[in-house]
């Protein structure tokens, strides 16, 4: 099959068994994507609660691993100390190890994959192959307003927003804009996300379902997510079953 050849799964039989078996057991293996400020955290809480999903955050897994004493820990610390990104192979291994501990449980993978190479690794892994891939779609200007309006109090650690949650007048002079909340940084992060999201979608044969969050309340977005999860899967069948050659 085309996908087995192109993405070279570690175990082709396990790959196929996982794909069809998860759907037969009605398991949710949800990948939730979205640009910075799209509201992934809010919707992840809704989904985890309603569908009893195990929440998987690659960032949290990396931080937890750094507090352990293992060969992987040493590798991660070495990359971090040099200011380098942790290789995809290590991140994928951490996710696979974590999923192995939760058995046949529904799970939500938060904000991953972020690149074409990560998507390819996810697709090639029988344990990580998702049943649903959903993107929370937001407008760049809305993200700039949402994140660019944040203000941080270095004394208390509290975060405010100049429009939605202004800081009290007595501390207004001491709140600051964090580096990640500068407009130029936000726009660059959005650009990188949008560029890579299209590549991720391509790896999964355009199986990413986008939910437009503009003008929608949190509850309305949650309802749309519920509708998507009412489907057995969003993954295009051509990922597993190759298209027949058309007769000339």
Swiss-Prot record:
One Pfam entry name: ADK
Gene Ontology cellular component list: cytoplasm
EC id: 2.7.4.3
Gene3D superfamilies: P-loop containing nucleotide triphosphate hydrolases (3.40.50.300)
Binding residues for AMP: 63, 84-86, 111-114, 118, 178, 189
Binding site for ATP: 37-42, 150
InterPro entries for this protein: Adenyl_kin_sub, Adenylat/UMP-CMP_kin, Adenylat_kinase_CS, P-loop_NTPase
Alphabetical keyword list: ATP-binding, Cytoplasm, Kinase, Nucleotide-binding, Transferase
Stretch list, region NMP: 57-86
Catalyzed reactions per annotation: AMP + ATP = 2 ADP
An MF annotation (GO) of this entry: ATP binding
CDD domains, per database record: ADK (cd01428)
Subunit comment: Monomer.
Matches recorded under HAMAP family: Adenylate_kinase_Adk
PANTHER family per the UniProt record, alphabetical: NUCLEOTIDE KINASE (PTHR23359)
Name this polypeptide is given: Adenylate kinase
């Amino acid at each position: 099959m085309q996908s087995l050849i192109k993405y070279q799964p570690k175990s082709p039989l396990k790959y196929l068994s996982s794909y069809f078996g998860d759907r037969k057991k009605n398991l949710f293996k949800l990948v939730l994507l979205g640009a910075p400020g799209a509201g992934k955290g809010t919707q992840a809480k809704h989904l985890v609660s309603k569908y009893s999903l195990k929440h998987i955050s690659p960032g949290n897994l990396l931080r937890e691993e750094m507090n352990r004493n293992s060969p992987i820990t040493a590798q991660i610390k070495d990359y971090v100390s040099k200011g380098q990104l942790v290789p995809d192979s290590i991140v994928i291994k951490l996710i696979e190890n974590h999923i192995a501990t939760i058995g046949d449980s529904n799970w939500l993978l938060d904000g991953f994959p972020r690149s074409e190479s990560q998507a390819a690794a996810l697709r090639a892994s029988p344990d990580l192959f998702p049943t649903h891939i959903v993107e929370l779609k937001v407008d760049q200007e809305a993200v700039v307003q949402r994140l660019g309006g944040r203000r941080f109090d270095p004394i208390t650690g509290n975060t405010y927003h100049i429009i939605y949650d202004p800081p009290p007048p007595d501390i207004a002079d001491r709140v600051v804009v964090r580096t990640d909340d500068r407009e130029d940084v936000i726009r660059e992060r959005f650009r990188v996300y949008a560029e890579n999201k299209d590549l991720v979608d391509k790896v999964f044969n355009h199986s990413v379902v986008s939910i437009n969050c503009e003008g929608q309340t949190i509850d309305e977005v949650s309802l749309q997510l519920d509708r998507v999860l009412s489907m057995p899967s969003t993954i295009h069948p051509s990922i597993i079953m190759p298209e027949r050659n058309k007769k000339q």
